[in-house]
Design a protein with these regions (language model features):
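TM-loop-TM module centered on a large, flexible mid-protein loop between adjacent transmembrane helices
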Residues: 35-43, 75-79, 185-248, 266-301
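A generic transmembrane alpha-helix motif of multi-pass inner-membrane proteins
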Residues: 128, 322-397
């Protein structure tokens, strides 16, 4: 079933990736995917609400990844002490925020090292576990209902969120029209192959109950039967690298995004300020939100929200793409299929989650309402300020 999920999620990600690659090649900008929404729908409330939704979803995902880092670090160094999970999560958020403050070159170098280490070790893990798979554990008899599989695609979409980050790198590329699509397709292709191989290896080694009980350390536990305790430690170190890299990737686009959205009045102007001439206020605010989420919220209870909101946003971007497809040269059929595929997964996810995890749906609604309220509230304040300035600058009679 995990293999089917990976295939389905990879297919949806590939369809959205095609849309993003075409948009990125035509509109290379620091605003990334939110710039694409503006191209299709203008700079009104729709784009503003989408911007705040993106900010919220990315913060949830970044905080959740940081907590995963904390789980592995705590398991390795403190015997799984829950207090240390939070401490390590805070440390990785702070460390990666500093990396992003130092500059894009350090971000790129750090991310390159992390990617090579993680991809290399995960490939080794996949080969070793696949060589010792128990086919009985992968038998279709153990699969859940189709509706649960379709619903889970929205959750496992979390694994592919990195390709959305690629759209924000256009400002740092020498030839974005050529390099961005290539990076998009390579990232999606490599990720899909590795995820499918890992899914087969893990679920062909452990029972579903063992995977669930292992929680965030399931990958390390799956390495033990073949590689022993050394395998557990190897995969734990890999997980530390992977989650550190994902935290870094979550923080990377915030500076450019905040500046671009403040410029178009989607975000308040103070989010574009550079404190001390260097430190992005938007980045600090985002990091603070991530810290609050990591410290004070049960992210396991709302783990699906960040992924589902991201899929919703990506679908809206592809809808926006349909409105400017003549400018990008994208294939209309592929864009329509991308929208329809996501349109099937999202309602199924909402319905299934409403039954099994009503708290997650409540959280989703709260995020939507807050995004609408913040956008309308901020733009009303901006309109009042503009009117006041115009009134004060008008010549007195």
């Amino acid at each position: 079933v995990r293999n089917r999920q990976s295939n389905s999620t990879g297919a949806i990600a590939a369809l959205q990736g095609y849309s993003f690659a075409k948009l990125g090649a035509r509109y290379p900008t620091a605003g990334g995917l939110l710039e694409y929404v503006a191209k299709g729908f203008g700079d009104g409330h729709f784009t503003g609400i989408t911007a705040w939704l993106t900010f919220s979803a990315n913060a949830i995902v970044t905080a959740m990844v940081a907590v995963s880092f904390g789980s592995y670090a705590s398991a390795m160094f403190t015997g799984g002490d829950t207090a240390w999970i939070k401490i390590f999560a805070v440390l990785i958020i702070v460390a990666m925020t500093v990396v992003n403050i130092v500059g894009s070159n350090l971000v790129a170098n750090a991310q390159t090292i992390i990617v090579y280490v993680v991809v290399g070790i995960l490939s080794f893990f996949a080969v070793v576990t696949l060589a010792n798979v128990n086919p009985a554990l992968l038998a279709p008899a153990g699969y859940p209902p189709l509706s649960d599989i379709v619903s889970s695609v929205a959750l496992t979409f979390f694994a592919f969120l990195g390709f959305g980050i690629i759209t924000f790198t256009a400002k740092d590329l020498a030839k974005p029209a050529h390099e961005l699509p290539r990076a998009m397709y390579l990232a999606l292709g490599i990720a899909t192959i590795i995820y499918i191989a890992i899914a087969l290896g893990v679920f062909g080694t452990l029972t579903v109950e063992q995977v669930i009980s292992s929680g965030g350390t399931a990958l390390a536990v799956a390495a033990e039967p073949t590689l022993g305790s050394a395998g557990y430690w190897l995969m734990s170190v890999t997980a530390l690298f992977a989650t550190a890299g994902a935290t870094n990737a979550g923080l990377y686009p915030v500076t450019g995004l905040s500046e671009r959205l403040a410029e178009t009045v989607q975000f308040p102007g103070f989010m574009a300020r550079r404190l001390g001439g260097r430190v992005s206020a938007g980045l600090l605010i985002y990091a603070l939100v991530c810290l609050v989420l990591a410290l004070f919220f049960n992210l396991d209870a709302i783990a699906s929200i960040g992924s589902a909101v991201a899929l919703l946003i990506f679908t809206l971007i592809t809808v926006a793409h349909l409105r400017v497809r003549t400018e990008t040269g994208a294939n209309t059929v592929i864009l329509v299929v991308a929208v329809v595929a996501a349109g099937v997964v999202l309602p199924t996810f909402v319905f299934t989650t409403l039954i099994h995890e009503p708290a997650s749906i409540v959280t989703l609604l709260v995020i939507l309402v807050l995004s609408v309220a913040v956008d309308f509230g901020w733009k009303r304040v901006y309109a009042n300020r503009s009117a006041s300035r115009e009134s004060s600058s008008s010549p007195k009679v």
